[in-house]
Amino acid sequence: MLEYLLEPFSYEYMQKAMWISTAVGGICAFLSAYLMLKGWSLIGDALSHSVVPGVAIAYAFSLPYALGAFFAGILAALSILWIKSISKLKEDAVIGFIFSTFFALGLLIISLNPTSINVQNIILGNILGIADEDIYQVAIIMLICLVLLLIFWKDLLLIFFDETQAITVGLSPLFYKVLFFTLLSACVVAALQTVGAILVIAMVITPGATAYLLTDKFKTLIKIAVALGAITGFVGVYLSYYLDGTTGGVIVTLQTLLFLLAFLFSPKYGLVSQKRRKVVDYD
């Protein structure tokens, strides 16, 4: 029995996939805490799909896909900030416009050059077949993101929580927003290998949303989100070996199940807890 349970660890490709998914899940969850605080979930969705044209162009010209995806994500984020700053359009309208435009452009590029582009890798990811050079890329991206987040997490918190107060203490909202979107784009690029373009949004939203239901303290929220992201990344890869299912699908399903548990049974915000309090108040 023990040998059966330890079987996935005997394969090098499984070991690589587990540790990469753990790192990606943890860092994406770190950023998801800020998306919850600011109410920017839709931006995470937009960036996760906006990298598709960058990946398609990179594949078409035999360039590192991470390079194309990163620059496409940065371009999308800067476009959102720029259009919002010069127009009277609401934020959700700008995000929806950029998201649909970039995604449509990506599909167009794929349709024009289908033979050179592995659509399945873009959509579903390919963590079990990840090459060593891609592992190094992801590891470097995650390390840089982690270091920058640990250095600037308090400044980002102030910018997201009270922009006016941040300006009075000498912080530049534009600089920190660009920094955040750069980090988010980098994490989306890394997560593409793990779960693919379609499910990236779950990794940058669900852990933060789950933690948001469990605590009112932001520092604790970050810790819970990172733990959930890392653990589901590791366990998801492990379980996918036995389920013979898509790794990204298993990871996101685990995150969704944990969210549903928090949604129902969170001590303060859970649906069951709220109904119990109403019954007590009524009595």
Task: Please give the residue ranges for each predicted region.
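Membrane-helix/interface signature in polytopic inner-membrane proteins
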Residues: 147-180
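Small-residue-rich segments of transmembrane alpha-helices in multi-pass membrane proteins
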Residues: 50-60, 97-109, 129-130, 173-178, ...
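Short loop segments and helix-boundary regions at transmembrane helix junctions
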Residues: 33-115, 212-223, 242-243
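Structural signature of hydrophobic alpha-helical transmembrane segments
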Residues: 13-25, 61-75, 139-143, 189-203
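Transmembrane alpha-helical segments in multi-pass inner-membrane proteins
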Residues: 198-249
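Loop-to-transmembrane alpha-helix initiation sites
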Residues: 17-20, 66-71, 92, 96, ...
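Transmembrane helix-bundle core of multi-pass membrane transporters
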Residues: 2-16, 87, 94-154, 282-283
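Cytosolic-side transmembrane-helix boundaries in multi-pass membrane proteins
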Residues: 245-252, 256-283
